[in-house]
């Protein structure tokens, strides 16, 4: 307990900052003084009209600029379609609050002063664009800190990565391509590179017609090649559930070659879990021939290592890029299970069975590799060739102990997965970004081998390979001065599967052809409204663990197995969303979304019970699965220090199981997260209320709350940060109830929670780059 108190005290201590500059603040309103203005351009000028600081107002109309030298200045605030506001100020250190700023109805003040407002930021149909070249702060700030100039985009104190509206970025692209120095998983170099290496930042909002992204992503356009130098990050994690992780990552960029290295080690030995269940099986006439009660106690531990290295090099003034990567990993795990089962039949004595099992699995080091080459002849136009190879193997030894057998029973399983993927991508975009096209073609090959030698002497498994040839094509464009964006695409694929079931010698060969279309649109209208709509068709092939016919009999009354006869599924999704931005202080945004999904040949997990009340769980193409949902999301800001996001949703799901039985149910969910800026630290809180144990056979869904609490701190000068948190703060080691049913049985399961967990995560960044001075730009227009 004393250690916990010590860490908490050390964690929140912070030195009092010394203000060496003047912080100028204000809040921008329209000419009527009623509505706040987002994305207003704010500039601070010297008496000779030289720009010394710039920013854009956020969703509440607030802005903040740091002026580094004392003296007299002139501040201007402008916005497209409105007049401008001009005021002379004197900076002498500390803070200068300009209060409420009303934009004027004309630009006479700017013209008289000889100042021409520069467009820093604008909002398009699917993105927010910031012109870095027009901001003098780019020469003083690093890339990571500069990102906060885009309203809503900032570095998460919790882990040091960028997020938008408390949502982590899905992807980071440099010049619209994957980059080996800076990416979603390697963001720390931006803390040591000046922002003037960028010319433009594009924050791509979710559901972009061009990128089809589910979460926000970032596209950075460079003004010059990234500098030579090195950076590294160390991250560590430890929890009260005996789960630990340590990951060092480093990147070096030299004139000869660039090298990236990443190593990770993890260890986990979580508390054991005890689950209880009861099951009643019914005969065809509705009588109950048997009832079943049981419990199982499981425990496991695992440790793993992962090592990856990538090499990269550019040629022809950064137009030609090469990347090669190699990696390997190892995983060792041990599982222990004890079960006790009691079955009651009418007119017979109760039968009790006690079993135990241990299982040791080793996945040895195997080589993974990849290669990528890009050539661009101008921004938005280029070709990419890519190859990846993934290789993994595992070997498991299982000991089964049963009262009836006496001696232990032994099973041995060996599994391997080898994948090759080669593709070529061509994209084209006109200079004005009014239209473009993308086409990608490739071939994927997967080789699955699963073999099990059972204690009985029988052999099971499969020898299975799959080839997929595909071509994707997309046309995209924008209308109405980029207020509307659209995309139309189609994917064709031919799937050829060949294999044999080792148990029955049955052929697993089959092939199929899929035509997968896609349409997307995003439209901003009436300034504060955004309409987005899409139709997406997706193909999905079964995973190896779903296909593997290995029969897990460690619990003889609850058997688990795969299904090598599974076929792929094709799903259709239609969605529509309406977003409304508000100019009131406490409410930023409301969004309504509606969607409908249907999968004619859905892959689902299905349980059946035989006449001995033995349950077998496997995967099957059950038939049609459809769902419709509607959600309402809001972004609130009760005070300048508190951000609050809330989303409520309702979903209606319908499963048609083998064309014989239909299961329809409704579910509700709630997600909420809040952040509190205390100055010396940031407090986070999140709440999820979701139904548990949802399957095609679910019944009587129950909504369970899950709350997390965090306290985070980042020391900017030391480039050090971390978080102390509590997961599942509302629960101890209590139970969650779920129910599944079919025409032949009903089962109730009480699953024990692991309960609240305290954890600490830390990260430290170091780096040094040789950086050139910024070249002054004479044009500030956005392309």
Language model regions located:
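Short acidic/polar hinge/loop motifs at secondary-structure boundaries
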Residues: 177-206
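Extracytoplasmic beta-strand/coil segments of soluble accessory domains associated
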Residues: 144-178
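N-terminal periplasmic accessory domains that precede
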Residues: 95-102, 116, 143-146, 162, ...
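Face-selective signature of the C-terminal outer-membrane beta-barrel domain
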Residues: 304-333, 357-502, 524, 528, ...
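Short, acidic, small-residue-rich periplasmic hinge/interaction motif at the N-terminus
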Residues: 41-43, 78-82, 96-136, 167-169
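Short, acidic Ser/Thr/Gly-rich low-complexity loop/linker segments typical of extracellular
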Residues: 48-62
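Surface-exposed extracellular loop regions of Gram-negative outer-membrane beta-barrel proteins
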Residues: 494-498, 527-573, 596-612, 729-743
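Outer-membrane beta-barrel signature, preferentially recognizing the C-terminal barrel domain
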Residues: 510, 539-591, 617-628, 637, ...
